[in-house]
Amino acid sequence: EALLRQPAYLMLPEQEREILWAAALLHDVEKRSTSVDEGNGQVTSKNHAKRGETTVRTLLYRDIPAPFNIREHIASLVRHHGLPIWLMEREDPLKRACEASLRLDTSLLKQLTVADICGRISTDKEVLLEATEFFEMFCREQQCWGKAREFANGTARFHYFHTPRSYIDYVPHDDFKCEVTLLVGLPGMGKDYY
């Protein structure tokens, strides 16, 4: 219901509306298995998004067959639906935002999160909505709003995500040329004596 009240949602192409709608329906699917009463009147659902991603992927593969890119987009939205709220509080927010942008449309992610916030019974809605606005500004600044963050090449992307505290625009030397000799044959044909 909160999603339908967003003007940005109504202006989306039909395919993106359906993806967002499915993600909104399924984003908390694993709260049923992860909810724990902490004993102080507080109920937590740690890792429900990670488990939800797996459940959604399985559901959209086995029970309701969906094309690969649509299935993965919905599963990624479910996995990252809390990212706009807590991004700036975590270690290396740039890496997390860029990583998410490679898997999903960050503008759709913000819409999903806003709908989730508006559908809650909560006293801190304004603070959470402000966090989603900061998320949008941060993604725009880092060139990953509504599109995947672009890197100079695949080596630069790999280096950034696999090297701690690396600079996002660093381009490593990529002269990886070498000569390969590949011997193919049946066993016992003399490949060892080439």
What annotation goes with each model-predicted range?
Residues 1, 18, 43, 76, ...:
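Generic ordered-secondary-structure signal
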Residues 2-131:
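Divalent metal-dependent catalytic cores for phosphoryl transfer on phosphate-bearing substrates
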Residues 104, 115-161:
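Charged, amphipathic alpha-helical linker segments immediately N-terminal to NTP-binding catalytic cores
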Residues 140-194:
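Glycine-rich phosphate-binding loop of ATP-dependent small-molecule kinases
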